[in-house]
Design a protein with these regions (language model features):
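Beta-propeller-forming repeat regions
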Residues: 21-374
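Sec-dependent N-terminal signal peptides of Gram-positive bacterial secreted proteins and lipoproteins
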Residues: 2-27
Length: 374
């Protein structure tokens, strides 16, 4: 009987392993199978092979709206979409030169060909954005790279390179594509970035955040465009929370109905989560944390509780956790933290203070939320 139970248990374990898709002794690369290419993507891939050879490995942005190795956008001044492709020519190295960015276009017969190819600015792709800036219709490509090593010694004046002495985890490059040529216009280190109209002037800016992983104070920069030049806006600085070790989430939203705001979720050294809220007021960049009378308790909460737009009104709510009735005295009792239940008080910033929007129960583990009636 014992042997039969043992065999049954072993069989059940084997079935569960098969169903989970996990196999002992395999690495994560074997578990990540790229999606099957569409017919059009297959034509693009074949055109890429003619230029780059067959030993290529497609890469894709790790965050943001665009998560494909093949991104179709019209990035020049001619009709029709181009295709931006990210790939590596040697998958066994972190050498930045092994990462390539290729723009493919169609000829007069409708066949794809590689129009231009450049080396990437890092070891892998972190984020991809497209935007026009100022009163100009030209669409620019913003590529964020993971960087293994920061080297600021090769600044090229022609590329308007701007580098920070601190060592962030990523670096963005702004590219233009005109007359079949990619030009690298600007470069800046960052931890997180967001393309948005933060100063409410009707035009997009790039907001970059550098956290304090290297021991420096966290900072924010605003990249603007004028007269054909990208530059960091001078004087647009604000004191960031120096207790934040790293920022892990960035969102754009509003305060009220029309004031743009940037919401940054950061992690402190003790693992707790905090939110930095930045916005323009009276022509200067402001932090809600520094507003007079703002309660500090809104800033700190358990790890993993991120700000979000819970009611789809474009105003980001910031969570504040409160123990449910019956758990108030749990610290004096033998109750594990994982067994405690909390209500989430979702707060918004309005009229210079955080105000309660609604109360809900939010279960992060099972990803569900229900509101508590008033």
């Amino acid at each position: 009987m014992v042997n039969r139970k043992w065999l049954l248990g072993l069989l059940l374990f084997a079935v569960l392993v098969q169903l989970s898709g996990c196999y002992p002794g395999t690495g994560t690369d074997n578990l990540l199978v790229p999606p099957k290419l569409t017919a059009e993507q297959d034509k693009i891939y074949q055109a890429l092979e003619k230029t780059a050879g067959s030993n290529i490995n497609l890469r894709y942005p790790q965050t943001g709206e665009y998560r494909s190795s093949f991104v179709l956008r019209n990035i020049d001044d001619e009709p029709g979409d181009e295709t931006i492709v990210f790939y590596k020519t040697n998958v066994n190295t972190t050498n930045p030169t092994s990462l390539k960015v290729s723009v493919l276009d169609k000829d007069d017969l409708g066949n794809w060909y590689c129009a231009y190819d450049i080396s990437g600015g890092g070891s892998d792709i972190h984020q991809l954005e497209f935007s026009s800036f100022g009163a100009f219709d030209q669409l620019f490509m913003i590529v964020g790279y993971n960087q293994a090593i920061v080297d600021t010694s090769n600044n090229n004046a022609d590329s308007q390179l701007t580098a920070s002495p601190r060592q962030a985890s990523n670096v963005l490059h702004i590219y233009s594509y005109r007359s079949g040529e990619i030009k690298d216009l600007f470069s800046q280190e960052y931890s997180l970035m967001k393309v948005m109209d933060i100063d409410n002037d009707g035009y997009q800016e790039i907001v970059t955040i550098v956290d304090s992983k290297t021991g420096d104070e966290p900072s924010v920069n605003i990249i603007e465009y004028n007269a054909g030049i990208f530059y960091i806006s001078q004087g647009e600085t604000v004191a960031m929370d120096d207790s934040v070790l790293s920022y892990v989430n960035v969102q754009s939203g509003f305060i009220g109905t029309n004031q743009s705001a940037l919401y940054l979720d950061g992690v402190r050294e003790d693992g707790s989560t905090t939110t930095e809220l930045l916005f323009y007021q009276n022509g200067t960049l402001q932090s809600a944390r520094l507003e007079k009378g703002v309660v500090d308790s809104i800033d700190t909460r358990k790890a993993g509780n991120m700000s979000m737009d819970v009611d789809s009104d474009d105003v980001i709510e910031i969570p504040e956790l409160h123990l449910m009735p019956g758990y108030e005295w749990s610290e004096y009792m033998d109750v594990q933290e994982s067994d405690k239940l909390y209500f989430t008080h979702w707060k918004i910033f309005s009229n210079g203070a955080f105000q309660l929007k609604k109360i809900s129960y939010f279960n992060m583990g099972f990803n569900y939320l229900f509101d508590i009636p008033d």
